[in-house]
């Protein structure tokens, strides 16, 4: 006890004398589970072997065993991931620690360990004292292939930290490494630098006591680079870059400030966050025209588990010399569209220039049944009531911690829930064998071998029959991308994506239905439930999960020309892609010679349905704003396909019937049966392939040369934009020859400045001239004959967002929209300085506005994110 008092006294004195001192932990455990010798990791930290006195003496015989990874990707460090301790039964570690809050970090690498254990199929629970940290947890379902995982928790402990691993039925548990680190007293429970936890949506501040545990969900260095554990301020935390969480393109600006010295204080000592966090930040930008910032927000989206409360810690520090007094920069803070702080003035609250500060907020993310992993949205928007010097906002860091519920539970659901964990393929138990057990084992093995041989024969025959129908490989994924090991829930490592048959597709990618379930969902494929018919077959409206979930069920017809190849392509593509503007594949069925794909249900059908309305009396036309929002959403989906995955994915069949609309008219790209993986190396510029697509939308350069690039999708999307504007078919015979081709007709009218005469008549009183001009510019650039003259989808997204901003700005100013004055930048087919300027400016995402107290939040579409979340092929977060 005296030693503890002396340590605390020393820390307090050092904080007074030198506020820049990092924290020195009093408890440090780095356990390399399963290893027999101490080893140093890549950062120079020393990991020790398991001390027998830390292991429970109550464990049954053979409760655990150790093994080495049979295969380890080059990007995965050997310490602590080469060795593992594997548990057959409940197993408890007991660590003697000083009273207080502790970091607990668990290290996992799901791979095969020897011949005894395949961690990919492992399901287990983890408890610490009275807290449930993980329940029926699958490491493999939580991260991409060939990645490692670190789960970080913060738990209050009296004198012993009891860590228990419990395998789920018919499964084993495992762990590679255990880390326990102490922290400053009540560092995450007392609140921000002002010792307050602001309770968002409530009038009373939130208090945290020792009955609560945390899970670190995100820790982000906003505007800066990744900060590794040894770069932290003594607690070995890991800070990610924020680029993967930003909403919109070119969101904000990062100031270029060098030589900044942070002046830590008693309220914000150096251990709160390293200098790398406080010396970097993200601003809204637009310094020369700050009023532009009133039209958008700085927005981040973070996927979290529904049904939990979260502590969101925001870090701030004013490091720009021009912000040197109170009132220079004032902004509002929102979480999930709820106002959390109306007037945030970092200079005033922190006390001045280069003085760091941090605030804590408690945010509840309700389980509303719409999503298992909703986005926790963080918005910063300028506060304009007091006319600050700069309409701007600033943020340096974000930490998001999940709070345990009243039962002490922190465990969320696995990304793909399963009714029960799969049994281990090989789970031998060490112990004394008996000869009487040998004969039954031999009989079982022989019988299984015969059954397996018969099954393989059937599969081979089916596959040969399918390949006879189609010998073109639509997805070339033979190249094995490099791996990456990272921290926490945001793991962007990838592994081999070799094509698999549908029946062997991992269940964590999508759900496999039996034909009985499919027939039950569609009332045995009842004809009146058909909601669409295409080249693949019929699409049925159905219900799964006892009628709780509406789905779209696409069934391959025996006479379909597309056949099994497109079925496999779409299954292979969509099972690995997750984006809010791509239709979600829920599962598939390949029983009884049936080929069925199950998607999320899109209540508002296709974009074509709403452009070419059958019943114009009961089906109102889409407004110009809604058309822009739909186009932006579809463009973001294509943008993700082109730049957000490990390799470029080319859709090849973009058209209005393949853009679906959900209940909120959010656009989602669908039908990936013709999709191809683009160039897989820097030396490749295109893919040579047989021409496929839909007449009218087909890229003429692709048709002539059979050379496929992502610019082919850009062309098809440009045709969609023209349909949205003019609301007429691409080809018409009952019109004069000069009007027969939509693309030529629009180009001709654009050059003659008469586009206002050919747009959809329903838009005449709604569309604004400046918005239409920019929309036409980008649409016509998309449909240039030469692919090199077409813009990338990044530019298309930005231009459409800008068109939406121009429309809303003009509406606010009550511009006269009856007279449309088009000012084309030049003849179609040329690029002028005016067009270059259109795609070189910087702006943020623009959306509708809502008002809370006097603070205006510009509400963007949170579905555009990014994140987006965790999936196996993510490579460039900014492309989200």
Curated annotation (Swiss-Prot):
It is a single-pass type I membrane protein. Keywords: ATP-binding, Glycoprotein, Kinase, Membrane, Nucleotide-binding, Serine/threonine-protein kinase, Signal, Transferase, Transmembrane, Transmembrane helix. Belongs to the protein kinase superfamily. Ser/Thr protein kinase family. Its EC number is 2.7.11.-. Pfam families: Malectin_like (PF12819), PK_Tyr_Ser-Thr (PF07714). One of its GO terms (cellular component) is membrane. SUPFAM superfamilies: Protein kinase-like (PK-like). Residues 472-487, 494-505 have a biased composition (Polar residues). Gene3D superfamilies: Galactose-binding lectin, Phosphorylase Kinase, domain 1, Transferase(Phosphotransferase) domain 1. Residues 462-880 are cytoplasmic. This is Probable receptor-like protein kinase At5g38990. SMART domains: S_TKc (SM00220). Residues 1-21 form the signal peptide. InterPro entries: ANXUR1/2-like, Kinase-like_dom_sf, Malectin-like_Carb-bd_dom, Prot_kinase_dom, Protein_kinase_ATP_BS, Ser-Thr/Tyr_kinase_cat_dom, Ser/Thr_kinase_AS. Residues 22-440 are extracellular. ATP binds at residues 531-539, 554. Glycans are attached at residues 46, 136, 158, 210, 256, 263, 297, 324. Its main location: membrane. Residues 471-505, 820-846 are annotated as: Disordered.
């Amino acid at each position: 006890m005296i030693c503890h008092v002396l340590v605390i006294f020393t820390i307090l004195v050092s904080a007074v004398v030198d506020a820049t001192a990092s924290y020195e932990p009093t408890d440090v455990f780095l356990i390399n589970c399963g290893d027999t010798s101490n080893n140093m990791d890549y950062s120079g930290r020393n990991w020790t072997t398991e001390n027998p006195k830390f292991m429970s003496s109550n464990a049954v015989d053979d409760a655990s065993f150790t093994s080495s990874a049979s295969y380890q990707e080059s990007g995965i460090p050997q310490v602590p991931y080469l060795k593992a301790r594997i548990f057959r039964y409940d197993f408890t570690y007991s660590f003697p620690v000083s009273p207080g809050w502790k970091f607990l970090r668990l290290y996992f690498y799901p791979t095969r360990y020897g011949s005894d254990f395949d961690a990919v199929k492992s399901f287990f629970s983890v408890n610490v004292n009275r807290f449930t940290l993980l329940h029926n947890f699958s490491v493999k379902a939580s991260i991409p292939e060939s990645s490692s995982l670190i789960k970080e928790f913060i738990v209050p402990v009296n004198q012993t930290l009891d860590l228990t691993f419990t395998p789920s039925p018919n499964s084993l548990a495992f762990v590679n490494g255990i880390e326990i680190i102490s922290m400053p007293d009540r560092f995450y429970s007392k609140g921000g630098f002002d010792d307050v936890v602001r309770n968002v949506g409530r009038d009373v501040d939130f208090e945290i006591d020792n009955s609560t545990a945390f899970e670190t969900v995100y820790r982000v260095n906003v505007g800066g680079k990744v900060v590794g554990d040894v770069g932290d301020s003594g607690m070995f935390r890991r800070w990610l870059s924020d680029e993967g969480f930003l909403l919109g393109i070119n969101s904000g600006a990062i100031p270029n400030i060098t030589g900044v010295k942070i002046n830590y204080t008693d309220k914000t000592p150096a251990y709160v966050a390293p200098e790398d966090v406080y010396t970097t930040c993200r601003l809204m930008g637009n310094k020369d025209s700050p009023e532009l910032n009133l039209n958008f927000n700085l927005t981040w989206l973070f996927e979290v588990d529904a049904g939990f409360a979260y502590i969101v810690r925001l870090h701030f520090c004013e490091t720009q010399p021009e912000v040197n007094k109170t009132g220079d920069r004032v902004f509002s803070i929102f979480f999930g569209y709820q106002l959390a702080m109306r007037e945030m003035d970092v200079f005033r609250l922190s006390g001045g220039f280069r003085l760091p500060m941090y605030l804590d907020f408690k945010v509840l993310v309700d389980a509303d049944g719409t999503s298992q992993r909703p986005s926790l949205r963080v918005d910063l928007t300028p506060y304009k009531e007091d006319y600050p010097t700069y309409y701007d906002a600033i943020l340096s860091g974000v930490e998001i911690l999940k709070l345990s519920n009243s039962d002490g539970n922190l465990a969320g659901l696995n990304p793909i829930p399963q009714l029960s964990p799969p049994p281990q393929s090989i789970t031998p138990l060490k112990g004394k064998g008996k000869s009487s057990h040998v004969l039954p084992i031999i009989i079982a093995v022989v019988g299984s071998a015969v059954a397996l041989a018969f099954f393989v024969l059937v599969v081979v025959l089916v596959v040969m029959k399918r390949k006879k129908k189609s010998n073109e490989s639509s997805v070339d994924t033979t190249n094995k991308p490099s791996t990456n090991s990272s921290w926490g829930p945001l793991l962007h490592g990838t592994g081999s994506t070799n094509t698999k048959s549908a029946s062997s597709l991992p269940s964590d990618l999508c759900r496999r239905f039996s034909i009985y379930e499919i027939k039950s969902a569609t009332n045995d494929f009842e004809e009146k439930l058909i909601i669409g018919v295409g080249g693949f077959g019929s699409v049925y409206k159905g219900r799964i999960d006892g009628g709780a979930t509406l789905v779209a069920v696409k069934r391959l017809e025996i006479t379909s020309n597309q056949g099994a190849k497109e079925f496999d392509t779409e299954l292979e593509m969509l099972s690995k892609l997750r984006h809010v503007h791509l239709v979600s594949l829920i599962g598939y069925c390949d029983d009884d010679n049936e080929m069925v794909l199950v998607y999320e249900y899109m209540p508002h059908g296709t974009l074509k349905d709403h452009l070419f309305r059958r019943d114009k009396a009961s089906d109102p036309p889409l407004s110009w704003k809604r058309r822009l929002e739909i186009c932006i959403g579809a463009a973001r989906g294509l943008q993700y396909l082109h730049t957000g995955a490990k390799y470029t994915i080319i859709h090849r069949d973009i058209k209005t019937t393949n853009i679906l609309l959900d209940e909120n008219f959010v656009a989602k790209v669908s039908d990936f049966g013709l999709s191809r993986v683009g160039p897989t190396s820097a030396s490749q510029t295109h893919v040579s392939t047989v021409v496929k697509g839909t007449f009218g939308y087909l890229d003429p350069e692709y048709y002539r040369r059979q050379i496929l690039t992502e610019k082919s999708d850009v062309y098809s999307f440009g045709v969609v934009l023209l349909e949205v504007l003019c609301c007429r078919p691409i080809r018409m015979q009952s019109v004069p020859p000069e009007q027969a081709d939509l693309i030529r007709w629009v180009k001709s009218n654009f050059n003659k400045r008469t586009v206002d005469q050919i747009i959809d008549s329903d838009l005449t009183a709604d569309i604004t001239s400046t918005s239409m001009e920019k929309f036409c510019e980008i649409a016509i650039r998309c449909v240039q004959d030469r692919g090199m003259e077409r813009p990338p989808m990044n530019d298309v997204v930005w231009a459409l967002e800008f068109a939406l901003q121009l429309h809303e700005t003009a509406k606010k100013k009550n511009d006269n929209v009856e007279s449309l004055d088009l000012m084309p930048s030049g003849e179609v087919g040329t690029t002028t300085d005016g067009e270059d300027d259109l795609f070189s400016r910087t702006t943020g995402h623009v959306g509708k506005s809502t008002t809370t107290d006097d603070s205006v939040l510009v509400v963007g579409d949170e579905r555009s994110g990014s994140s987006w979340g965790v999936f196996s092929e993510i490579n460039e977060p900014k492309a989200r």
